[in-house]
Amino acid sequence: MSNPSGPIASMLNAQQAPDDRYQRFADLAPFVREAIDTIAALTPAQRVDVDFLEREFIPALGLNDELLHEQPPELAPSFGKGLHLWQYPNQLAPYLAWLARNAAGITSYMEIGCRWGGMFILVAEWLRTSGADLKRVIALDPIAPTPFIATYFELLQEQARIEPIYMQAFSTSPLVAAHVDRLKPDFVFIDGDHSLRGAMQDHLLVRAHASIIVHHDIHSRACPDTTWLWKALREFEAPSFDAFEFTNQYPSVNGSFLGIGAMKRRSAQA
């Protein structure tokens, strides 16, 4: 997460969350191991079964319970549970299926704006159980590691197969730029500063190294800058990247929200 601005700041800045919310995540930290086991237990067929992922797998992992006017009420039984994924299952499911088909060759995963860490954990584990030769995972956020992140990193350190790196900083920090140049992450999920300039800077930060760049909130009434930026990037990056969009909506929600946009460097296309 880079410097947030405007109304999106209160949504994204976990430093503003009350202490009881941190305690909730501390209480839920044991679920991290359960989630890892659940992901690892999936069969290859289940990993590309979009209907199964949408209706069973993702709701069971637990969904976000903030800004519920943006959330489909039919998913209420999953709100405020587990990994607290701030995603629509009908967007995340086809994205995960796509990722399962494109995980080969990925050695490092970076998330800009990891916040509580649920999505970071899901994607990192999804990659390493879907054929990626994952050697390093990098989480970036200006807040200190949350209970989810701390628990996950402890597990990775115990296993000693994947190097976990946490950078507590804004993505505009020169130190972050130096680390990116050194670590050269080849798959990056951008969900930090939702201003036009901030999201574009994050894209440029990783473009030279990443074979896959994914942007969040590309089809959201609440995030006009990132929505517009995705449309522009889709055109500007067309000579080098193929674009894939996951923007399904729920009729029960008034408006369009969230949205995942993935870009894969054409030279890396399978």
Where are these regions (language model features)?
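Rossmann-like AdoMet
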Residues: 1-87
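S-adenosylmethionine/decaboxylated-SAM
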Residues: 6, 75-270
